[in-house]
């Protein structure tokens, strides 16, 4: 871990496996109503080892409680999407997925379940962290006009090459899971 920003829930990691793939960061950030795509590994690799993509829009330029470091998106995200890229239709990074609305809390407060209420850290927060860590990155210049020349499928395929699966382990959790698995195995053997 090179840098950990607990407030924004972002960590900068260094890998011994360096690839040539990267995602340019949008210099002009996100715009409300902008089409977006989210890539990630919802529920880890339990569904499949292939990354998944969902589509949506930027719903608001602030997160919960007017949090200016976040934006609200309506693209579907699940556990396992956290840390994944949020890109615009040009393949530029405009955010990093971070959270979804807590159904139980929202139901207790409003007596209704939230739909498509998800959040991402804005790319500006990421560039602040990268700058503070003296890590170089590439931005794209603001583009005021989009002529639709980009093929979205090709754009997503390029970003997919730079999206990696990351599995985090806690020795305490791993030991607990190992004990539970062993207990299930003993129960199975004893019942036969």
Where are each of the predicted segments found?
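Catalytic nucleophile loop of clan PA
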Residues: 76-97
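Extracytoplasmic
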Residues: 6-10, 18-20, 31, 53-58, ...
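Conserved active-site neighborhood of the chymotrypsin/trypsin-like protease fold
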Residues: 1-48, 66-70, 132, 136-146, ...
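Short amphipathic beta-strand and strand-loop transition segments with alternating hydrophobic
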Residues: 1-2, 62, 154
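C-terminal cap/linker of serine protease catalytic domains
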Residues: 20, 42-46, 93-191
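A structural connector/turn signal
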Residues: 24-25, 72, 151-154
């Amino acid at each position: 871990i090179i840098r950990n920003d607990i407030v924004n829930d972002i960590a900068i990691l260094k890998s011994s496996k360096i690839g040539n793939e990267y995602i340019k960061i949008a210099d002009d950030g996100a715009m409300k109503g902008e089409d977006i795509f989210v890539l990630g590994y919802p529920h880890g690799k339990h569904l499949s080892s292939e990354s998944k993509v969902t589509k949506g829009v930027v719903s608001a330029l602030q997160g919960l409680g007017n949090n200016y470091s976040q934006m609200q998106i309506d693209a579907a995200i699940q556990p396992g999407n956290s840390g994944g890229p949020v890109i615009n239709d040009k393949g530029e990074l405009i955010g990093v997925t971070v959270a979804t609305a807590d159904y139980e809390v929202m139901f207790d407060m409003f007596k209704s379940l939230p739909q498509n209420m998800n959040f991402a850290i804005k790319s500006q927060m990421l560039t602040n962290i990268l700058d503070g860590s003296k890590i170089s990155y590439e931005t794209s210049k603001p583009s005021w006009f989009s002529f639709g020349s980009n093929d979205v499928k090709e754009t997503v395929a390029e970003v997919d090459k730079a999206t990696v699966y990351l599995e985090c382990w806690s020795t305490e959790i791993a030991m607990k899971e190992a004990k539970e698995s062993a207990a299930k195995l003993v129960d199975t053997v004893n019942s036969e």
